[in-house]
Amino acid sequence: SSDIEMNRKELRQRTRDLYMNAPIGTAAIKATRTSCVGIGLKPKPKIDYEFLGISKEEAADIQRLIKKEFAIWAESTLCDICDLNNFYELQQIVFNDWLMNGEEFVLMAYGEKTSYMPYRLRLKLVTADRISTPGSLDGTYDGYDQTTKLGNRIMNGVEIDKDGKVV
């Protein structure tokens, strides 16, 4: 175990306190978030029209359609399983939480199609505080990792196999 694992709860508390109560802490996190995330991830399709045997014009039409269809999903709050934020806002939240907490998890789920949302993909954000090893529910590192029936280890709420791969 490292010093960070043993002190992560206290480190998160201090970072959040600085973010909420010290203007310089708030500015540092927000400026970093804005500089790194910017307007967010957007598709830039580049179709190899020669390989596909289509014209440049057909490829340009398909590229426009891809951007349009992505925007239908990304600009809607229905991309968020909680129906609160659009994809670009979720990116800002994830990066902000990562800076404050050291990690953030994004789960992919599938909802129902609707007449105004033809895509089922939904994203769920899980803050690092919600991830813990069974028995350490308050996020305090107790120095012990758990071993599963399959021989995998659970360390700080994340299950890994013998090679260190997250499972």
Residue ranges and their predicted role:
Residues 24-25, 40:
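Conserved small-residue
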Residues 30-167:
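Structured, mid-chain assembly/scaffold modules that mediate subunit interfaces
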